[in-house]
Amino acid sequence: MEKSRMNLPKGPDTLCFDKDEFMKEDFDVDHFVSDCRKRVQLEELRDDLELYYKLLKTAMVELINKDYADFVNLSTNLVGMDKALNQLSVPLGQLREEVLSLRSSVSEGIRAVDERMSKQEDIRKKKMCVLRLIQVIRSVEKIEKILNSQSSKETSALEASSPLLTGQILERIATEFNQLQFHAVQSKGMPLLDKVRPRIAGITAMLQQSLEGLLLEGLQTSDVDIIRHCLRTYATIDKTRDAEALVGQVLVKPYIDEVIIEQFVESHPNGLQVMYNKLLEFVPHHCRLLREVTGGAISSEKGNTVPGYDFLVNSVWPQIVQGLEEKLPSLFNPGNPDAFHEKYTISMDFVRRLERQCGSQASVKRLRAHPAYHSFNKKWNLPVYFQIRFREIAGSLEAALTDVLEDAPAESPYCLLASHRTWSSLRRCWSDEMFLPLLVHRLWRLTLQILARYSVFVNELSLRPISNESPKEIKKPLVTGSKEPSITQGNTEDQGSGPSETKPVVSISRTQLVYVVADLDKLQEQLPELLEIIKPKLEMIGFKNFSSISAALEDSQSSFSACVPSLSSKIIQDLSDSCFGFLKSALEVPRLYRRTNKEVPTTASSYVDSALKPLFQLQSGHKDKLKQAIIQQWLEGTLSESTHKYYETVSDVLNSVKKMEESLKRLKQARKTTPANPVGPSGGMSDDDKIRLQLALDVEYLGEQIQKLGLQASDIKSFSALAELVAAAKDQATAEQP
């Protein structure tokens, strides 16, 4: 605070620092210097500091000179100060004593007032207790007087035949009884109240007995006035729940016992539905008057209704639930999932229809909040039902995802049973015969598990070696392989009996690989259809975030798409190996023409047709299962790879022929014989030229067949180079003819 009040002298504007920096609480020399160095050199900073230091010294001298007289007179002004202070001590002590005395007097006065106020409050409370007890006695005597007078009048036939009068008297008693109850609660613990309590208990018992009898009489005679007076009386004494319980026991329970019969439900084909229909008839037929009086019916007049009652929620519904739980326990048994699903669906439909009989939305909310409602829902063991369904689906799927790949049923759009079973499992999860709204989260998780399991299965297939057996033979288990990961996770058993036991790998045929790719493509096409099946089910429970569902299915599509390249590569490699297995027969062409006197070739070799036969079979045999683009991709890849190897083979053959030809020429020249004559003994084409011509015919025929496959020869890698190679050889062969 002192620093903030000090005014430092102002320095020149040329200073490289702010003078107020020195007065800050967090002033730091190092920070100050480093900050100034950013603007000026150290020499300039030093000069500015020295300049300001001189200004400070000058200002300090001026300040001392200005107040010099006050500094000198300071000791003089303090002379006699001790004496003056001593003179003040005596009167201050007297003042202190007077203040303490006054404080004591005031405290005593306050204490006396508090004591009197406390006594008055105690007297007031006791007076209120006495008044309440007096009121209790008066109410008891008044009620007893009314009851006595009513008893004396019961001899009169006129009064006895007037239930309305009885209802009015009960209302008067109830009003007085209500006040009696209020004052009795306020007077709890008073000795006099204990003496009066037996009389109060007698009044209570008689009042409840009269009300029950009157209510039953009104229900039996369908007298709206009696029912109205009786229910109003129950409401007055805050016993509405007793009235609802009475209706449940006397009116509802006998009907429930007659309707809910287990033998009828099990023997009748639609026994459960018939039973629920009869239960739904109870409210409109037997509770009409009660609902009109209490405002539970649409036609009720507001002025004549007695609020505070809900007989459907508090009387009918608890008795229905109790009857179902006690007399029909098999209803909730999940052992038979199909029967359980049917019973659950019919029961939930019954609950929805019962809710529509509620008089208002508030009544529906009360019904859903009722303990019996929660008890009824908990009785349905949905987790056990789902577990049974889960095992059914998982077991069926795992039975198809085995080492032995079986064909799908004839009517299926899929080729393999594994794919057919996967799609049928997905559809079954959301079928009307299995789906339950409360299990939607479990069913969605099972859907993703099925898709993931199929993706793992396909990845495993892509790792299998390709066998040379036909598709019919490959259906038989070639070897016993290890089991794949199961959708049930943890139910597989250890198949190995020891560390020395080997597990051979299961092979797969090329046709089966083609089927896998076709099924993958088909399944990806049908996943949007699955989304359309799922949407209505999710809308049923109010779910709106369909983008997340769609994204999850797109992820599954991506995982399926990621499997295709490896499968395609495997198929292309196998086709290429098969194709080149025949194309390498070009190595046998020299043996066919050398020293055999065969005619000049005019047609292509048969090995070309043999090499292309698998490709034509692929195109014709699977065009209804695969997209043409996929087939074309495989054909192009197969031909590109095999043609490249074929090019190398033909090149080697032509080079070998050329070397043989040159070697023979050199040999003949060395023997000084007749110069080598390229023509044959009969003056025709030489064996070497026949070889060249045959290879040219083979390659030309190969190009023609490629076009028949729907491909352009220019799209096949190495084919252009191969065509140029044999064209040059053909030109050489024809050029040497005479």
Swiss-Prot record:
GO cellular component: Golgi membrane; Golgi stack; Golgi transport complex; trans-Golgi network membrane
MF terms (GO), sorted A to Z: protein-containing complex binding
UniProt biased composition (Polar residues): 483-500
Record-annotated disulphide pairs: none
Presence of keyword Protein transport: yes
Entry keywords, A to Z: Congenital disorder of glycosylation, Disease variant, Golgi apparatus, Membrane, Protein transport, Transport
Compartments reported by the entry: Golgi apparatus membrane
Membrane topology: Peripheral membrane protein
Domain of life: Eukaryota
InterPro entries: COG2, COG_complex_COG2_C, COG_su2_N
Region annotated Disordered, chain positions: 474-504, 668-687
Principal place of residence: Golgi
Coiled-coil intervals, chain numbering: none
Reported disease: Congenital disorder of glycosylation 2Q: A form of congenital disorder of glycosylation, a genetically heterogeneous group of autosomal recessive, multisystem disorders caused by a defect in glycoprotein biosynthesis and characterized by under-glycosylated serum glycoproteins. Congenital disorders of glycosylation result in a wide variety of clinical features, such as defects in the nervous system development, psychomotor retardation, dysmorphic features, hypotonia, coagulation disorders, and immunodeficiency.
Free-text function comment from the UniProt entry: Required for normal Golgi morphology and function.
PANTHER family cross-referenced by the UniProt entry: CONSERVED OLIGOMERIC GOLGI COMPLEX COMPONENT 2, CONSERVED OLIGOMERIC GOLGI COMPLEX SUBUNIT 2
Family note: Belongs to the COG2 family.
Subunit details: Component of the conserved oligomeric Golgi complex which is composed of eight different subunits and is required for normal Golgi morphology and localization.
The protein's name: Conserved oligomeric Golgi complex subunit 2
Organism of provenance: Homo sapiens
